[in-house]
């Protein structure tokens, strides 16, 4: 049965009639007892209404009229005294001071008299106490609901006991029952001062109890009655569950409507307090992400379950399923529902562990789908546009060293449409959020129109395939559910954990004893061990020394993963078979890489020394020549952009562009020379990509005037200088030991290999900020130590500004001044943003500058991968990983380790690694 309250304006109440049960004794718990204090007359005339707890009443009357009038009087027995200290008896009345009882008198040989106890509403769990049944007393009673007699065999005996633990035992009460009534009697003599009692309860709801009494002995001419709230925890454990939902479609059903998550749901009785069957107070719970709530392990009866929306003008679902015809419908209207819960009651079913909603319930029975539908008067909707770097359709925000962290996409235009009407028009901010607050609710719903930026596609489009790149996207948007829009273009995309391609230099000529040494290799970017300690096959040998010789620049074609490398002049490592003008291509065929000549600038220009003359000395047994040509012939860095390969022809100081699809389509561009006073000293080498445009880095080497220190420049192809990089900052110790420090300050370019000679070798963007890798040319002039620098330049909204004192863009780095290992000044104004020190405790020595000669920021990563040396051993080629957020050195991946038995197996500390690039593929084909 469900009754709808209509006098509550703002609360949604589900009223489930139960009891306020406060104390536990074995498997029975007890609540309020009926107060008989108003029964003062020895004779009962008309009905008397008596209070039962705070909010219920019970009516006491004579069922037989004037012809048989019972004699009754209130009897409040003090608890805890000698005559009333039995613990089970005390538990029935909880922490009350008195046992509230009614005395019913009957003289020997007098006709029996009867009383009737009647409630206005059904009572679900109540216990009837009858005491002082002795000396041949005879008591009978029966019950009914709405005039229909109860099967009295359904009543349970809970306790047969006595009032006192200290007095002599009372007589034993005999119980006899059939379908129509229960009879009580006593045929034993006991201590008249120690009263006996029996406590019973019905298993079905009742509203009337008739009790009749007759005495057969003048020594016992009264019995006592008590009525108390109670519950049988072994048979009457219930749960209430349901959903709170936004009734967006006015359907009064939670199906296809969004849930209300995080909503506090309250439960109470009319007197305001609820206890579960473990005696714990229960008053509220919170809906989960599905809008689901439940109250577990409570006794059957009458409750109120409600929510209090923050908006007092909240409207509710228009229809109510008062007969529980549809399990998914709204069960509340005008603020409340009333339902009775008991075994076999309407909607009450056994708990089923195969039902997902019942999994956490410990009760025996449950009434499910007590659903509450809310109609939003004005609704607000919002969404988030983000850069989905790995295109997995999810916004990944977890910070790890080897995965992308998706970022908000600002500047995206979004419109809100009601059918064809534009309701709002907004632009996403720095947080990527677009919001439409306080728009009228419409039953047809709204559409968010995403004006996709050029070149981008949506990665989580709900109905694949997604619209083409740059096309407008229409998406359904609903309240209380953030619409996530993942966008990606090819430039920003990279699959999870891509392979990394890197150059490892081999000794001697390409056709000499190290011809088969690997030069171009790939390894997993998420490697957690040194490569030489990883299982066979983890590192792939793509091209050998005999195939490509000495190369530096590496470029990866995102379309198919082909890798391009360009010739490089390095001491004791000869050019490949096609000489100084060669660009090689390594491609996968039948799961195997094959390498061939892709482009020869010397041949293309019909001039065999256009890229410089090979100045190596062959055979290259113990000596090599031509060191003065390092950085001046062959090629520099290499990048691929928009279907073309770019590199720098060092001999002519030109930018070379070659079409990937047709190498006959190539072009040479003059590069602006910023070295006004000594134009011959201009040494461009590095390339990068900023805002979709090629940028170039180089140094004025000062080799024409060795008294000065080189200066670096970063510029656009147009010659617009983005950044000037003075190289006169302190650099700590190039090498240090127990008591020595070899100064690391930069010098002008020369043929003196042990001097540190700055060479801007790579440009890497981290968002709007730039990372400048500075290779030590001295490490390529001989087999001696090369020590590298790495500078960060932060964009202030107008220009790039170099780090200073280890701080960039207001963010402190890892090496504030002084940053040298022994406290020596190191870096611009004596501090460095990135920690590039190395200390080897075994030998008590190290270097203050072993940073990166080539830097990689995989799209979306917060880390910088750099080709470097020495992470935990001496003479070790290493890929180091730094945190771009704070400059901390996180870890290193050893690529090679110099062998004491065979020191010529690699270049050790002498610039043994070259360029490095991730193998990222295009997402948009």
Curated annotation (Swiss-Prot):
SUPFAM superfamilies: Hypothetical protein PA1324. It comes from the Eukaryota. It is found in: Secreted. Glycans are attached at residues 47, 95, 142, 166, 283, 334, 344, 378, 401, 511, 642. Keywords: Glycoprotein, Secreted, Signal. Residues 1-26 form the signal peptide. GO terms for cellular component: extracellular region. InterPro entries: Ig-like_fold. The keyword Transmembrane helix does not apply. Belongs to the serine-aspartate repeat-containing protein (SDr) family. This is Colossin-D.
